[in-house]
Structures are given as structure tokens and as C-alpha cells.
Amino acid sequence: MPSFDVVSEANMIEVKNAIEQSNKEISTRFDFKGSDARVEQKDRELTLFADDDFKLGQVKDVLIGKMAKRNVDVRFLDYGKVEKIGGDKVKQVVTVKKGVTGDLAKKIVRLVKDSKIKVQASIQGDAVRVSGAKRDDLQSVIAMLRKDVTDTPLDFNNFRD
């Protein structure tokens, strides 16, 4: 019975490369001359540092641009609130989302069941497994999910015949 998994996971190697490129650009840009602006990564948590709110926005724009160039969807980023860290300096914690959340998984299962396509969807941890009798049915489910779920980037892997 053919099946596939619906997952939502960023390529952390590409995220790391985008951070390194961002830090390199920030260190060479004239408008950041003499500032302490940088991006640090610890596992799935990024911390943006800057001298003020405006420069923090600039750091964020550089990071988003570099992520887009490396084909990392920026919808994976979950921005925390801006914190003051002494003087005028500010920081912002950004979390890289992983996995299909419970609400999104339920929404995907409901969409699949409401579509009247002859497939079954089941939640398995942080992924949703979709299985059906025909490969064409699974491909139509993939097309339907790409069209209907736009708030979170979805990947389809583990396609088995």
C-alpha cells in the first residue's frame, strides 16, 4: 500500500550557512562599522544582537535575505520579543520551528478526510502518514495540501510503493 509522510523541518545545515554568510556581510557593511551586530546559533535557537532597534531590523533583513538565497523558508522562523541588554544594545531570540504541530496535524487529517479522496491519514509523532491504494490518489493529496496549507512550509518524504 503506497504511503508518504508529511513533515515540516528546516535544513539546519543551510540555516547555519545562512547565519555564517549573514555574519560575514554584517562585519563588512559600512553601516555596521564599529557596532556589535551579529547572529549566534545554539541548536534550533538563533540570537540576533544589535546596537539599537533599527540595526536589529537590518540584521533581521540580512538574515532573511541569506536564508532565501539558500532555499530555507523563512516561515520556519518564530520571532521572540526584543529585549534590552544594557545601554542601547538589544537582542532578539528567534526559534527555528521543527515538526508538524498538533493543531496543524489535526488540520491536515481533517483536510484529507474532507477531500473525499480514498486515502487514510494518521498522526505519528511530529509527522502525518498518508496511505492509500493508488499512487495517483497520494499525488492529488500532495497537490491539495500544497494549495490549502500555506501558513507552514510542508515537505513530503518517505514515499513508498
Curated annotation (Swiss-Prot):
The keyword Nucleotide-binding applies. Gene3D superfamilies: YajQ-like, domain 2 (3.30.70.990). Disulfide bonds: none annotated. Nucleotide-binding protein. It holds the Pfam family DUF520. This is Nucleotide-binding protein Bmul_0741/BMULJ_02519. InterPro entries: DUF520, UPF0234_N, YajQ-like_sf. The keyword Endoplasmic reticulum does not apply. Belongs to the YajQ family. Keywords: Nucleotide-binding. One of its GO terms (molecular function) is nucleotide binding. NCBIfam families: PRK05412.1. One of its GO terms (cellular component) is cytosol. It comes from Burkholderia multivorans (strain ATCC 17616 / 249).
